């Protein structure tokens, strides 16, 4: 704070720039991270990147039954849902600490959301 109680704008700007760099680094880590979702106790595994790109699908041959395609479809949907959930959890873990720092950014200005 400067004399008279005014916030130091250069310090606020420096803090905002530092947080932006940390956010960009965390987003890059998330996008590059490999996440695997599974269902049926690992019978169906879907691997993807934090960016949302699916990179592989593995299906245990013992569950491939031409007479029961519906079960396989359900397992694939379950594995995709698990992949999505794990990707969101990864993003929360990486971005959560950065979001916590936003509370200090307003410097007591009473700005909404900071």
Curated annotation (Swiss-Prot):
The keyword Transport does not apply. The keyword Ribosomal protein does not apply. Keywords: Cytoplasm, DNA-binding. One of its GO terms (molecular function) is DNA binding. Transmembrane segments: none annotated. Homodimer. PANTHER family: NUCLEOID-ASSOCIATED PROTEIN YBAB. This is Nucleoid-associated protein MAB_0319.
């Amino acid at each position: 704070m400067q004399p008279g109680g005014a916030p130091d704008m250069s310090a606020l700007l420096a803090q905002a720039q530092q947080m932006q760099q940390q956010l960009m680094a965390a987003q890059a880590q998330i996008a590059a991270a490999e996440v695997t979702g599974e269902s049926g106790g690992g019978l169906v595994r879907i691997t993807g990147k934090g960016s949302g790109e699916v990179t592989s699908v593995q299906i245990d041959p013992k569950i491939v039954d031409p007479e029961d395609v519906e079960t396989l479809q359900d397992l694939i949907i379950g594995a995709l849902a698990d992949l999505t959930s794990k990707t969101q959890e990864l993003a929360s873990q990486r971005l959560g600490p950065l979001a916590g720092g936003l509370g200090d950014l307003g410097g007591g200005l009473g700005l909404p959301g900071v």
